[in-house]
């Protein structure tokens, strides 16, 4: 029996591919045809992140009777469509920028790839991960910087090592975003505010440190209070869409997990 959530996700995937005119990769002229189509593989990936399934193995067990392939082929197929997922995310964010709310929020969160005590033995993401520190303490992994608008539309995204300069990342991902962009005290910089300011188009509102004696108007306070929404997005991504994992055994597996979790968060 096919779960209802899978059928709903299959319909969503079909609609996305049709609306945005994203073509699946063609079947090779020579060699064996695909055991799992790109649309089905993407649906399986979203099913994992939108349901309670923590691993690809559990998803495979759910559909083993309907799949004419091995578990290895299933994993390869799901990881293969990460490029299709990346294209969909890019198209969705580009579309969201055209219809976005005036107020935007930018923030970063930690994405551990393993426990800190295991960092010396971790090899899979060694070229991309690094040691960083967040409000929760030290971690070994990546940093994800995200911009969303007041209504929850995802507008920009970037993965970096934890040691990358937050202000440089802010400039890069928000260079084509306009309106009022609100950020926390980690982005405090007079130069950043001057660089990003565009008269009648873009204004940066950065919350000052508690030790900084700066007056704040009532409407600025209300904008600052809205930052909890992007914090909730990070929480939902990690708790309910499986953004953080240490299970993949390849770089492609890690990146596919992050991209599929983000698309699941947007559409599921």
Each model region followed by its residue ranges:
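Short alpha-helical elements
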Residues: 1-268
């Amino acid at each position: 029996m096919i779960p209802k959530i899978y059928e709903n996700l299959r319909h969503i995937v079909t609609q996305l591919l049709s609306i945005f005119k994203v073509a699946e990769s063609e079947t090779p002229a020579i060699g064996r045809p695909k055991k799992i189509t790109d649309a089905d593989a993407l649906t399986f990936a979203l099913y994992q992140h939108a349901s309670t399934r923590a691993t690809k193995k559990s998803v495979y067990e759910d559909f083993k009777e309907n799949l004419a392939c091995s578990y290895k082929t299933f994993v390869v197929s799901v990881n293969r469509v990460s490029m299709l997922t990346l294209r969909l995310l890019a198209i969705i964010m580009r579309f969201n920028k055209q219809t976005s709310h005036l107020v935007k929020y930018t923030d970063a969160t930690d994405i551990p790839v393993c426990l800190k005590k295991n960092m010396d033995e971790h090899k899979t993401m060694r070229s991309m991960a690094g040691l960083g520190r967040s409000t929760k303490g030290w971690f070994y992994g990546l940093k994800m910087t995200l911009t969303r608008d007041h209504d929850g539309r995802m507008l920009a995204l970037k993965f970096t090592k934890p040691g990358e300069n937050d202000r440089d990342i802010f400039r890069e991902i928000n260079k084509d975003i306009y309106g009022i962009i609100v950020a926390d005290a980690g982005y405090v910089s007079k130069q950043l505010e001057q660089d990003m300011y565009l008269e009648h188009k873009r204004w940066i509102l950065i919350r000052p440190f508690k030790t900084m004696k700066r007056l704040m108007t009532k409407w600025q306070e209300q904008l600052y209070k809205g930052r909890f929404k992007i914090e909730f997005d990070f929480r939902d991504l990690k708790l309910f869409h499986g953004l953080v994992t240490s299970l993949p055994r390849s770089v492609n597996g890690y990146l596919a997990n992050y991209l599929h979790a983000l698309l699941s968060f947007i559409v599921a």
